[in-house]
Amino acid sequence: MRYDSGIALFDAVTDIDEALIEQAESYVFPKAKQRLFRHIGAAAAALVAVAGIGTAWALFGAQNGGMLNSGGYEPDYVYPAVLPLAALNNTAGITTERETDIDLGSFLTGQPPFYWCGEVTDSYTLTNTTDGDITVQTVYPYIGNLAGMNDEMPAITVDGYAVRTEIFVGDEVWDADIGEMFTEEQQRDKLTADGEYLQKALAGNISLDIPVIAYRMTDYGYSGDRTPNDPYTLAVRYDLVGHNARILTTGFDGMHYDNDTGLYRHSFFLPHNEYEDYPYPRYIIAVSGDITNIRIEGYKNGGCHPGEELGGVYGSVERVETTLSAIIREYMEKTEYYNERGYDLDLLMSKCDGVLRQHYILGGDDVQTYRAARLSEIIGEAVSEDHVIYQRFDVTVPAGGSADISAVTRKKADWLSGNEGRYYAVKVAPAYSISLDYTSQTACVSDLGHLEMITPEQDYTDRELGTEPVSLEPGTGNYEVKVKPVSKTNN
């Protein structure tokens, strides 16, 4: 809410009604997800996701955990590896060489882990050994989310010229087995049989033209006098109709379900005037069912407890038969955040489908919990969750000639703990010669900038990257460079 005086604002922030605290305690949130190490899950899941297109590798090589320091526990942050190029069509007669350059001279200074990253140039030379031109349908995958897609998407060039790519976004990659390692044979047999993940992504956006019944709040308010600090609340109680009925809401602050009576209640703080009201409609949306016995109630605050009823609160409910896609589109079009960032609404709605199924709003199972969710949280999760994002483009390799492909990415570095203390790491995933015949794969660090490599004996593996090119061997897991700021004693 917006207030006219600093004193009123101070009072509103510091003088919190106990009922509001109780309301927060009783609110039923959708299924929670642990997001602290979500990037670990994303990297592991990409092993399954990207391997389905014919290129498989062991992606998960970084550690989970953290360390104690003078400021308390500091968690590790793990980001996905640089993923290799793959092809969708038969590429017989094409050989591929890969060179990956990690430039740490562009590392940004600042507080870890969010402002430390380098520039990675992942280069490929496709050579045609036949006497006819061959067009390769290539896909370059990376792991990211819709919120950062414009900033994190690799810049693709072919023979030095920028190319326009077609974007396909797979399902969320959080739910795959974390850290599971596969042998090359297992990856070929288990992961590349049908390419289910990519095929689903290539199928395009999922339609949410699902019939729903929406109840829109109209003409609501309070007929009496009130001060700017009065958290007067309108509540809507109703009965749920339908064995598998689910509820979505927009514009409601609180939700309560009475296990004894089976009654649902949604509530919101009444605005003081039209300028304080939400810019989008307040809906109770029934999915796969309906609601009945709707009652409008007023309360002195958001706790909505017996004995705190308030007369003078009024409101009307308009019943609308529509579709879920129409509701979501209306919400996003009237929400400044989504309009300013230029999201593809069809793509975003398609990703909402997966989140709605995770929260049991869609799917049809008889689940007695999580039967209601806020639409804003569903959309927010669809924007922030990680997916394998594919950039698809065609490359024609002339007979007896070659074509050079380059993908430049601003790559976030892992922030990890080890025997040498805190350090940064950038990972590169090798490719299997399944969809493309890789004759060589190398990676190296071209510029360390103000960093130094760490390769302590107790942490050393044969997958360490350095300033000299290192051959990447499929089936051995990620290769990585470990670095830390140059110590003062070495300056």
Give residue ranges: language-model regions.
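Disordered, charged N-terminal biogenesis/targeting segments of membrane/secreted proteins
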Residues: 1-34
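Short linear motifs in intrinsically disordered/low-complexity regions
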Residues: 5, 12, 16-18, 40, ...
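Residues in flexible loops and secondary-structure boundaries
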Residues: 18-24, 28-29, 48, 134, ...
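Internal signal-anchor transmembrane helix that establishes type II topology
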Residues: 31-60
